[in-house]
Every structure is written in structure tokens, then in C-alpha cells.
Amino acid sequence: MTNIRKTHPLAKIINNSLIDLPAPSNISAWWNFGSLLGVCLVLQILTGLFLAMHYTSDTTTAFSSITHICRDVHYGWIIRYMHANGASMFFICLFMHVGRGLYYGSYLLSETWNIGIILLFTVMATAFMGYVLPWGQMSFWGATVITNLLSAIPYIGADLVEWIWGGFSVNKATLTRFFAFHFILPFIILTLAAVHLLFLHETGSNNPSGIPSDSDKIPFHPYYTIKDALGALLLILVLAALVLFSPDLLGDPDNYIPANPLSTPPHIKPEWYFLFAYAILRSIPNKLGGVLALIFSILILAIIPLLHTSKQRGMMFRPLSQCLFWLLAADLLTLTWIGGQPVEHPFIIIGQLASVLYFTILLVLMPIAGIIENNLSKW
């Protein structure tokens, strides 16, 4: 009798994706982050669903409803903090996942990579709108500043901003629509993630050595199911520690002050995972220039495959490129730190230098390093 998991229409899809999937035998822990992102997404959808049952998207009651969730709803505080800190874990996994793709040349799987970039933009949009919902000071002013960036678009900018706001400032209409979008987007992310996996399974996964592994494949189950389960356990352990010991570590104290349009906080800044892009935005004095730099700082990932000059796929055997990669990682940490600092000397110049270095490494130095390494390998 044929095994039901190989014949049943639904079970067959699961079988081909999670059980009998041929996987390279040498993929390291850096390949765990894809499944961890799946765990984060499911966790966010579940905690978000329970929060939505008690949240009210009205400017007069939004802040109070969050207080109500934390004080009166049974285990509401843990659901709220798991959702808020779950977003931070989501972005840590995202950055690791993208970094892995850059390091090992996974961007050469172009369809998977491009869907990944769309996913990154969608997750960033979702997180931004989620940050507006508690209707604290940073929620309100963050929404005002970031949506206002669209006014830099020539001709239609001002009308576009008012259309998004649903009025002449961030108001009740803005909050309601942001809640609606924040609720629907994770399901769009789920669909995009399925397409991401579909394209990945068309070509098969990359591996640390960067050479084809068709001659050396092992079944996904039990080898990588147990490995992913361990990764998920560690992720939940870190998240639990964060939620139970210091839930406000990554948040902003200003968000415990109800939104007040008449009082601007001394330093408006987004959540920590957007600070690198925010620093790039602020490093350019011109508004439109800043917005373009902000968009291009993420969109630059789309042209990375075109800038690949090396004969080798990954950076495993390319010391020059490795140095540049870790310089890029340090540069992003510097930008993240600068994004959280006030706009004054010496932070302005540090931010500008770090921004220039970011684009220089990706657009100029890495392609040159690839060519140099090609020539060195001939010796």
C-alpha cells in the first residue's frame, strides 16, 4: 500500500516541503533563520489576534485599551509584551537571514531573493503601522514624521499625505486605517512566504560551500526538523527571557505618555530595528534626497545579484570580501546607534560618514573585491 503522505493531495504538499525534501547535508545554523521567521510570524499572528479582541482603534480609547489589556485581561500583559518583543525577535531573525543570503551568495537565486525583498518591505510596513496603534507620544509623532516624508514627492506629495491621513493631521481616521492594514498585512506576508518557499524549492537550497550539492542530499526529516525545533526552542527561550525580565528594554519610555499633538517629544525616533534607515534618512540635509536614500538603502538589495563579480558564489573562501562584509555589519550597528542619538555634533558627521560607507561597500568595494579575488586565485 502506498504511503498516504505521498498520495493525498494536501499531505503530498507538506511531505514535499517538510519531510521528503532533499536538503544539502552541510547547511549550518545560519540556515535556521528561515524557519525561525516562520515561528515568529505564527507567534505574531496569534498574539495579535488576541490583542485585537480587546483593542479599540479610536484616538480617545486606544491608549486606555492597551492599559486595560495589561491590567485587566487575563495574562494580557504577557500577550502584549510577547507581541511587542516578538517584533524585535522577528527583525533580528530577518537581519540574520538577509545577512546569510549576502554572505553565502544566496541572492543568485533571483526569484527567491526578489520575493524576499518584497517580504522585507511588507514586514517593515506592518511593524511601522503596529507601532502607531498604542497611541503613545512616540506612536503619534513617529506616524506624523514618517508619513510626512511622502510630501517630498513632487507635485502629488501634499495631497498624498492628506489622503493617507484621512484629514489634515494624524487623527482618528489614520489610526483606524492603520489598525485595518496592520491586521491584514500579516496574512499577505504569510502568502508571500509561501511563494518565497515555492521558488526556493524549485531550485533547492544553497549551502555554505557555494557549490552544487545535488550529489549529496539528505531528507529534511528528521535531520533538519530536529535542528529547526532546537532553533525554535532557543528563540522562544530568548523571547521569554526578554518578556519576563525586561519587557521594556527595547521600547521607548515616551510611548507610556498618551499622544498629545500639542507637545512634541525632544527626540522623535522609530523602533530600534528602523534606526539604521532613519540615520541614513537624517544624514542628507535635503528632504527628497533623504527619502530616496532611505528607500534605496533597502532597495539596494535588489541590485546585489547584478554586482556579483566573483567566480565563487559565497564568501567562505574569499577573505577580502569577508572583511568588507563584517565592516558592513559594523557600519550598520554604527548607523543603528546614530539613529537613536540627537541631531547634533559629532553624531551628524558620524551618521553621514557611516551612510556613505554603507553605499560604498555595497556598490563599489564588494564588486572590486570580487575582481581582485578572481585574479588572486589564478596565482
From Swiss-Prot:
Residue ranges annotated as transmembrane are: 33-53, 77-98, 113-133, 178-198, 226-246, 288-308, 320-340, 347-367
- One Gene Ontology MF term: metal ion binding
Q: Which UniProt keywords apply?
A: Electron transport, Heme, Iron, Membrane, Metal-binding, Mitochondrion, Mitochondrion inner membrane, Respiratory chain, Transmembrane, Transmembrane helix, Transport, Ubiquinone
What the entry lists under PROSITE patterns is as follows: CYTB_CTER, CYTB_NTER
Q: Name one Pfam family in it.
A: Cytochrom_B_C
Name the coenzymes or cofactors required. heme b
GO-annotated biological processes: mitochondrial electron transport, ubiquinol to cytochrome c
The principal localisation class reads mitochondrion
Tell me what topology the record assigns in the membrane.
Multi-pass membrane protein
Presence of keyword Translocase:
no
Q: How is the cofactor bound?
A: Binds 2 heme b groups non-covalently.
- Positions binding heme b b562 in this chain are H83, H182
Show the GO cellular component annotation of the record: mitochondrial inner membrane; respiratory chain complex III
Instruction: State if Acetylation is listed as a keyword.
Output: no
Per UniProt, heme b b566 binds at H97, H196
Tell where it localizes: Mitochondrion inner membrane
- State the disulfide connectivity: none
Which residues does the annotation say bind a ubiquinone?
H201
Q: What does this protein do?
A: Component of the ubiquinol-cytochrome c reductase complex (complex III or cytochrome b-c1 complex) that is part of the mitochondrial respiratory chain. The b-c1 complex mediates electron transfer from ubiquinol to cytochrome c. Contributes to the generation of a proton gradient across the mitochondrial membrane that is then used for ATP synthesis.
Quaternary structure, from the entry? The cytochrome bc1 complex contains 11 subunits: 3 respiratory subunits (MT-CYB, CYC1 and UQCRFS1), 2 core proteins (UQCRC1 and UQCRC2) and 6 low-molecular weight proteins (UQCRH/QCR6, UQCRB/QCR7, UQCRQ/QCR8, UQCR10/QCR9, UQCR11/QCR10 and a cleavage product of UQCRFS1). This cytochrome bc1 complex then forms a dimer.
Family as reported in the entry's similarity comment: Belongs to the cytochrome b family.
Add the further remark from the entry: Heme 1 (or BL or b562) is low-potential and absorbs at about 562 nm, and heme 2 (or BH or b566) is high-potential and absorbs at about 566 nm.
Q: What is this protein called?
A: Cytochrome b
> Could you tell me which species this protein originates from?
Ursus americanus
